[in-house]
């Protein structure tokens, strides 16, 4: 099998890991710690003796904001050319600050420009803090990023609470706000449960894959060693058998020189005077130079398939092979009855001590005409082995990729945003 064919599945596994590594997660942004903000809101409605108070526990300080307490009156931007301005992104954004107010807090809606622009514009008008409410009702506050905004405090709250406060401001009702530092939340790259899940799953997957590969290669090594030993012993047995066969030189008047006599079945040529021939136990005659190499590999008569090892009593009932390095699939084609007979003969032999191939599921050696596996068949067998190994690698890579994506999915609640 070519190196390119073996590298194909391996490249797929590498591509899967590369895709996983480039998966768009928020792990880099989510590694920052953040502080929660505890916000108390006091609403002084006209004609009502007791002010209305409520608390916002889900506020969050900006990443670049000072983590400090602040108190002030809440103000929203003035309309621009008669159009309400809740975003604070327009260069003409203005705030009406009553003369008797020393500290005030700007209330702005998220969107349309960066947090830095909103906060800087409010700071330009001397706000001590900026409260930005989300622009999506189902989203929790995020950690805002706004470098270079100075000492102004920036906090984000939910859309629901922000619009509640805005509704009072639109009615010209005074709203006071106190912002206090809440809990420091450490970086959260992986939830504990996700980390345990990824670790255990990956370890189990690697153990199973490694055990399978180790078992596979051990069996392959055992098979190869047994095959080589049997091949050497078969070769020795064939040489011993050949040495016991009768040879003679064809002389004038011998029956082999008769034109009607069979030609040599190996080279398909007639016998001539002074040719050295080999006589097999089945009485078939061949050129010695032709049949000896054949017998070394096949150990059977080229014509009647007689087993010369068995006929000479060297290895009784031993099936011969022209190539012991056969592929596994061709071995499984013959019947189980012949396999048991062949392996029984191998185990019962005492002259050479040949051992059967220690590979489960191997059937007997096929007939000589089918023994030599074609190049395409060998390539298919080897390709299948590499495909199985590469499949385990690809499966491991995809599983690990899935587990990492699943674990990082819990990071959304800790994201850092710029606008």
UniProtKB/Swiss-Prot annotation:
Keywords in alphabetical order: Apoptosis, Cytoplasm, Glycoprotein, Membrane, Metal-binding, Signal, Transferase, Transmembrane, Transmembrane helix, Ubl conjugation pathway, Zinc, Zinc-finger
Enzyme kind, highest EC tier: transferase
Induction line: Up-regulated in response to interleukin-3 (IL-3) withdrawal-induced apoptosis of 32Dcl3 cells (derived from bone marrow).
Signal peptide start and end residues: 1-27
Tissue note: Expression is highest in liver, with lesser amounts in the lung, spleen, brain, heart, kidney and testis.
Catalytic activity: S-ubiquitinyl-[E2 ubiquitin-conjugating enzyme]-L-cysteine + [acceptor protein]-L-lysine = [E2 ubiquitin-conjugating enzyme]-L-cysteine + N(6)-ubiquitinyl-[acceptor protein]-L-lysine
UniProt cross-references to Pfam families, sorted A to Z: PA (PF02225), zf-RING_2 (PF13639)
Chain positions of all zinc fingers (RING-type): 264-305
Start and end residues of each PA domain: 105-176
Cell location: Membrane; Cytoplasm
Domain of life: Eukaryota
Positions on the Extracellular side per record topology: 28-194
Ranges of the Cytoplasmic topological domain: 218-419
Transmembrane parts of this sequence: 195-217
One Gene Ontology term of the molecular function aspect: ubiquitin-protein transferase activity
GO biological process: apoptotic process; programmed cell death; protein ubiquitination
Topology in the lipid bilayer: Single-pass type I membrane protein
GO cellular component term of the entry, any: cytoplasm
Residues glycosylated per entry: 29, 40, 112, 135, 172, 189
EC id: 2.3.2.27
InterPro entries, A to Z: PA_dom_sf (IPR046450), PA_domain (IPR003137), RING_finger_E3_ligase (IPR051834), Znf_RING (IPR001841), Znf_RING/FYVE/PHD (IPR013083)
Purpose of the protein: Acts as an E3 ubiquitin-protein ligase. May have a role during the programmed cell death of hematopoietic cells.
Protein name per UniProt: E3 ubiquitin-protein ligase RNF130
Gene assigned in the entry: Rnf130
